[in-house]
Amino acid sequence: MTTSAAALQSLWDSVSTEDAHRHAETLTEYINTNGLRTLLSERILDELLDKLKDKKQAHLRERAAIGLGAVASKVAGKNAPMPLGAEPWLVNAIPPLLDGYGDKNEAAKKAAEGAMGALVPLFPPEAAAELLEMLYSVITSGTAKWQAKVGALKIISRLADLAYEQVGDELTQITPVLTQGMHETKAEVSKQAIKTATKVCGVIDNNDIRPFIPDLVGCMDRPDTVPDCIKKLSSITFVAEVTGPALAVMVPLLSRALNERSQTVQRQSVIIVDNLCKLVRDPHTAAMYLP
C-alpha cells in the first residue's frame, strides 16, 4: 500500500518531467483517498514547499512545483473530493512559486508558472483581497526577482476577470502598488505595471470616464501629463453615477491636479470635483474619500 512518504520519494526520484507528472498524480490520489488532513498531518505540503525552496537542486524545485500544481488541479477546485478542497492550505505556496518565475533552470521555471496557473483560478472572489495582499508584498519588495514581480502583476490582471467586483472594491489599494511598479528601474516590470493598470481600470463602470482610462493610467506613470488629462476631463458632461472604482482612480488624480501651480488646472479640477460629487449617490462610498 502506497504511503505519502513513498509517493513523495517517487516524485523526487522521477527520471523525467513526464515521469514526475505521473508520480504527482499518484500523490494526489493518496491525498484524496486518505483525506485532506494528510497535507498537514503527514507533512506533504511542508515537504513540497521545502523542496520548492531548495537552492542547490533544480530538478527538486521542478518536481515540487509539479507536485503543487497537481494538488491544485486534483485536490482542489472542481476536482476536490469534498466541498472544501485544498485551497486554504495552498496559499503559502504563492510566494515561493512566484519566486520560481525567476529560476535560471527553464524546467523549474515552467513548472512554477504551471502550478500558479492551476492555483490562481481556485480562489473564490471573496478571497481576492487576501490574494492581492500577497501579490502587493511581492511587487513592492526590494528583494523579489523582477520576474516574480511581473508574474504578480499578470495575476492581478487575471483577477480583474476572475473577481471583477472585488478588484473594483480594492482599486484604492491596487493603484498605489501599480504606480510603484511603473517606476521600477526594470523595464519589464514597468511595462507590465502599465498593462495591468489599464486592465484593472477596466472594472470602472462609469461610461463617462472609461474612454479616458489610457489618460488616467498615463498620469500614474507620468505625473507631468496631469494638466493635459485634466483639460480633457474638464470637457466632459458627467451624467453617469460615480461609484467607488471611479473615485479610486479619480481622487488621486484630482488631488495631484489641485496641487498644480497653474490656476487654470486648479479651476478645471474644482469644476470636475463639483460635477463628480453631484453624481455620488452612495454616502458610504463618498465617506471613504472625505478628508
Q: Which residues does each PLM region occupy?
A:
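Short linear functional motifs in flexible/disordered or boundary regions
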Residues: G35, L60, A76, K109, ...
